[in-house]
Amino acid sequence: MASVQWHSRSRKYDSEWQASRLEVSAVEFSDYHPLKAITVTDSKSRRGGRKGSTSSSSSSSSSVAPDPLSSMLDGTDPLSLFAAASETPTLPHSVSAGELGRKRKEKEEEVGLDFEPWSSKRGEILSRFTTTEKLSINLFMGSDTSKASSPSSAVSEKVRTRLEELDDLEEGSQRELLNLSQQDYVNRIEELNQSLKEAWGSDQKVKALKIVIQCSKLLSDTSVIQFYPSKFVLITDILDTFGGLVYDRIWSMCADPHPLPESFSADDVNDTAKETCLNWFFKIASIRELVPRLYVEAALLKCNRFLTKCGIQETLQRLTAMIRGIGDPLVAVYARAYLCRVGMEVAPHLKDSLNKNFFDLLASFRQIHGDSVQNQLVLQRVEIPVYLTLYSPAINWILQCVAYRAPEVLLTEMMDRCKKLGNNALLLNSVMWAFRAEFVATRATDFIGMIKDCDEAGFPKHLLFASLGRSLSCADPPESERLSILNEAWKVITKVRSPRDYINCAEIWVEFTCRHFTKREVNTVLADIIKHMTPDRAFEDAYPQLQSVIKKILTYFHDFSMLFSMEKFLPFLDMFQKDSVRVEVCKSIMEVFIKHQQEPTRDPVILNALLHICKTMHDSVNALTLDDEKRSLALLINGFIRMVSFGRDFEQQLSFCVEARATFCNLEPVIIHLIHTVNQLAMETGRVMKGNHSRKTAAFVRACAAYSFITIPSLTNIFSRLNLYLLSGQVALANQCLSQADAFLKAAVSILPEVPRSISIEGKQRSSESFLLDFINNFLSTLLVVPDHPEQGVLYLVRGLLNMVQDYTWEDNSDAKVRVYISALPLLAAMSQESYLYTIPKVDSNETLYGGDPKFIAEINKLCETLIGQVLDHLKSLGRDEEVRRQGSLAFSLFGCLLAHGDLRNNKLNQLAVNLWNLSHKHGICDTRTSVRTLEHIKHQAQQTDMSHFSDMTARLSLQSRA
């Protein structure tokens, strides 16, 4: 292809803009509405009505509903019909209204989501009640008497074998393991649980029962008393597993021919399932010892549903009475807790048995202080306060079950009964744990009186106040009593000598203080905490509680001016001396500030405090810090910077950014945000001055440009630098800082060779080519308004950019360089126009500097010819079969550029355009729809004045089918 002489097409942007605007036409709405049902009228009258009228006024008209979906409906929503059908299921005639009422009542009494399940308490008990003492356990080893009889055995032999199995339940081969550590003990219990499942899976039901009995016997043993609550949790897990296996087994026997409904009755159960169920209960009845018999039967409580209607209720009453025969009060209270747990799962509506368990507990409460217990504690060297805490999980659970949705009258009665007991601190503690927070809060003063009457030696009063504080953090006491409640509580808390006990209690009451009082009271509480936790660096062992204190304060105090004016708040933060904890606390403070600070601030108290907090976060960054953590910290610091505003005091704002740059130099996203902030500051200054800068504001925007120019090179990300150089150059131009803008743009061009061929994005290597092309296109669009430097040559920035593109090492088999050349042609064509498409106010671009000087136009044309020559040479080199697609795409791109920006009245340029069209369609790989639309556009353009040459060209452009 021969070289051509370039001529830019003359553009009249205003007239083109007007011609391309959409036509505005008035819309007559009348009675029309797009959602209104359409009625087609067949009118016999021929009077001049509008075509397609929706009027239905004709006397002899027939309405037709053309919407096929509407015609299928009779006016009723089909989804509503389905919903109505599902809400009113067909009921069998045998179900009476009374039965429905009973079931509805039971459903209302079912345990809801507001009931804290046992599973949530399990982990806390296991972690709290530990021991270093050695433990022992009896492992079941199996027995030879449980061999399966042959099919030919007589019935009498089966009976005899069954009796032998029952006798062997407690006398099977056992192995006692001594001197086990706590972890070994837990592992052995887990082995038993696994053995139970394996025995059941292999149809060795009797062996499974023996394992459960042996495990249940362990609950009679209190030789290592501190571990008993954890032992209870582990053993009852096995009991729960066993109960579930037996229930599922009997349920499956009822599935023939139809599975049982969820709300089945004993009448729905077949005889085989009932017989199997009875057989299990007969086996359990043969267990000689009370404790294992009680626990195993409780585990199978749900199976009573298969036998009789009232079986569960009767069994609960009987087992409740049986517990009275257990002599050890600790064993008895946990047996009651298990019975209440199973009862709440199986029949939560049977409240009487729950209440009976509680009142029986009260009746036997004095046993705790009896001689036998005291002797046992002396033998095991356990103090009374420690011993009493062993009861807490069981009593708390019993009271939680009893108090759940209980009427106020019952709760009041239970509280009165607790008052009548001597040494009732343990019960009082559980009452405050388990009763509704609203109930406790309204009687807070009464509870404080009861706490005062308790014996300090038996149960520490600070634990009682801690339990009271938990309730008061969820519900509010009467307003008139709040101050006296806080004073009474803090009198006790501040006297606690153990730092651990003190902070555990103080942390709870901080929420009550923040919830109901001002910063004065909160400051006093913080001062007291600092006083108690500073000696011997006790705070180092209480970081979780101290963090909780901070979070509670931040929950209720969102006025940071008030918060940082607290005398003791920052000294309190100084107690967090472990780096990781300190950073977490700082992050929580910043998160609350960003979330709740509504207006930008210039308060020096807030700024100094938050700057210190952000610096703490920033200084935690090191070479090992993960990228996600860096992003998280940068996000919080940027949120702080965004909320700092000095109003019209722009110089103070810039000074803050200078200080922030020095403080946060290790976090690149923060530096980038600061550059954006300063650029925004310069633009805001220009907006205030309405583009007419005074000497002072002109100096200020130059200072902003200097800030950005100095800061950008410190960034490591090459594309961040490129984009910020370009953006800062645009800001400088907008504020008439021409030399600064020139420096920014030259700096951007100078670092183009540093762009790597691939970059890491989210841990993956990706080609940088597409990002570089995007940047260059943005850069080219800016160059239209940048005036040439008087000491440099014509179009020196454009030439510099193109030279860098020429020398850049592009990827192999890449067309990126040629695409940049094609992208530069519209810029050069726009520069040759008499008036530019866009300009910057008060900045003289090249249209003013050169005023259409023929030498300037000649330089542009010469550069365009060079670029087109480079593109054509590249197209010639793409001759191989595998390159024709790239060749066609580039040819079509250059054709579009010539069509839009070249003067096609020039015959050579016109012929080049036709050749490019033919080349792009030569192999039939060009998008047909795009080609058709392009031809239509050319034909439309040909209809305009001085565009007749398009008609001749259209005749020479043909569409070729795909090969």
Curated annotation (Swiss-Prot):
Its main location: other. InterPro entries: VPS35L. GO terms for cellular component: endosome. Keywords: Endosome, Protein transport, Transport. It is found in: Endosome. GO terms for biological process: endocytic recycling; protein transport. PANTHER family: ESOPHAGEAL CANCER ASSOCIATED PROTEIN (PTHR13673), VPS35 ENDOSOMAL PROTEIN-SORTING FACTOR-LIKE (PTHR13673:SF0). Belongs to the VPS35L family. Acts as a component of the retriever complex. The retriever complex is a heterotrimeric complex related to retromer cargo-selective complex (CSC) and essential for retromer-independent retrieval and recycling of numerous cargos such as integrins. The recruitment of the retriever complex to the endosomal membrane involves CCC and WASH complexes. Component of the heterotrimeric retriever complex. This is VPS35 endosomal protein-sorting factor-like. It comes from Danio rerio. The gene is vps35l.
